Amino acid sequence: MTAKQRWLDARWAFVRAHLPPAPARVLEIGCGPEGGFVPAMREHGFAAVGVDPVAPSGPGYHRTEFEKHQLSEPVDVIVACTSLHHVTDLDEVLARAAEALTPGGVLIVVEWAYERFDEATARWSFDRLPDSGERGWLHSHHEQWLASGQPWDDYLEGWAGREGLHRGDAICRALQARFHTRLRTHAPYFFPDLHPVSEADEQAAITADGIRATGLHYVATRPAAALG
């Protein structure tokens, strides 16, 4: 099983818990080449579609950016999993998400708060990188950080700036400006790339060892009228 599939399997319970009853209409922003949660949502009776420039081919998937996707009708739910920190214009994407939702519709966000990825958390993660098998993004960061000769914080901020990433706290502020917050919490994030480290293992280290939870879970509803 790939790290991506381990991630989707681990986060499906959270997404499923906040979906309204089927057959609600659901759109996933940034479903990726695997289709994100769309297959699982369809299995559970939801009318789910995925939007991503690298979405799978086939019915229900749209190979385009969400900002350019034309909806035929509003949806009941939008799911965004580790996609918002990558978008070019966060405000534009969230404005379109609010427009795409029915009044009272649900927004489910699974994100990464990269600003919480401090050196202690990085070292804990790098110490647990698998020696064989799939080499993922954490392997690359470990190698690039060592090669840079920079302090970790300088390396991380430089990389995030070059990639144009949005901070988790900035994502939350932008969400709160347009939606009614129902839930906001941090969670383990790195375990899928550290197999056989489990989510419980990472949570235990967060609780006992002082590493930081960099995952971000956020659930909100679209108000009947614009906020502010």
State what each model feature region is.
Residues Q5-P23:
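Conserved alpha-helix/loop element of class I SAM-dependent methyltransferases that forms part
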Residues P23-G32, I108-S140:
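Conserved class I S-adenosyl-L-methionine
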Residues G32-K68:
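Class I SAM-dependent methyltransferase SAM/SAH-binding core
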Residues V79:
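A conserved beta-strand element that flanks and buttresses the S-adenosyl-L-methionine
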Residues E92-P103:
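A short glycine-rich, Lys/Arg-flanked "PGG" loop and its adjoining helix->strand segment in the class I
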Residues Q144-A174:
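A conserved mid-domain beta-alpha-beta active-site/ligand-binding segment of alpha/beta enzyme cores
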Residues D169-R173, A177, R182-G228:
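A C-terminal cap/extension of S-adenosyl-L-methionine-dependent methyltransferases
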